[in-house]
């Protein structure tokens, strides 16, 4: 595979596309995807799963040490930005997932966390942007993720998939936005998770 395209749908209309070259892909085996890219000296590692209702982004330095960010209006600095999302669907050199609004921000200790955007999740339900099945699975995914964090297993869980160590992550490619209408794998009523 020369490149991998990661389609990340943020309903109702924002389909973001991230492109990764072969050097960025650390794992892609149908069950999990792990990619990383350098954003000006800070490395962003992205984990997506075929059987879990969340994705996780981790910031490190090039030596593999965790780096915390403080981005307003978030109430805590964080290293792990966990998105409740549909499981990824792989299609040739692309993966697709739908962000389901709820975020879990976790500090570098892997234990201190904050759950945010639950109000946006409620609004999405009211607007019909996700199905009842997706809403129930999102709640279960949030419970599973919090359980991993509270059992002090987040770092071990991610390290088992791909150890944290020094990296030669290539520079990130620019993110693009594309029309949702062209991609039924993320469109309401036709996506597999609906």
Residue ranges and their predicted role:
Residues 1-44:
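Charge-rich, low-complexity N-terminal segments
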Residues 26-75, 80-90:
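Catalytic core of tubulin tyrosine ligase-like
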Residues 55-66, 78, 98, 128, ...:
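Extended soluble regions of mature proteins
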Residues 58, 84-92, 130-133, 156-171:
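A broadly tuned preference for mixed-charge, low-complexity surface segments
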Residues 88-107:
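Short acidic, Pro/Gly- and aromatic-enriched capping/linker segments at domain boundaries
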Residues 103-146:
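A hydrophobic, small-residue-rich beta->alpha segment in the mid-to-C-terminal subdomain
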Residues 140-194:
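Cysteine/selenocysteine-centered motifs that mediate thiol-based redox chemistry or coordinate metal-sulfur cofactors
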């Amino acid at each position: 595979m020369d490149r991998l395209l990661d389609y990340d749908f943020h309903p109702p209309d924002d389909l973001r596309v991230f492109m990764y070259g072969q050097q960025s892909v650390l794992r892609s085996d149908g069950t999990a995807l792990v990619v990383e890219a350098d954003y000006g000296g800070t490395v962003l590692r992205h984990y997506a799963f075929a059987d879990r209702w969340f994705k996780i982004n981790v910031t490190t330095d090039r030596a593999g040490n965790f780096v915390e960010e403080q981005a307003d209006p978030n109430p805590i600095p964080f290293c792990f930005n966990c998105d409740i999302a549909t499981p990824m669907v792989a299609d040739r050199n692309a993966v697709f997932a739908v962000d389901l609004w709820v975020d879990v921000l976790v500090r570098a200790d892997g234990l201190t966390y904050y759950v945010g955007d639950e109000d946006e999740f409620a609004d999405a339900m009211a607007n019909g942007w996700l199905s009842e099945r997706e809403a129930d699975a999102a709640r279960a995914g949030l419970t599973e993720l919090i359980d991993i964090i509270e059992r002090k297993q987040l770092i071990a869980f991610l390290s088992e998939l791909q150890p944290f160590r020094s990296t030669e992550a290539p520079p990130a490619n620019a993110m693009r936005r594309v029309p949702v209408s062209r991609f039924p794998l993320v469109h309401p009523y036709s996506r597999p998770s609906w």
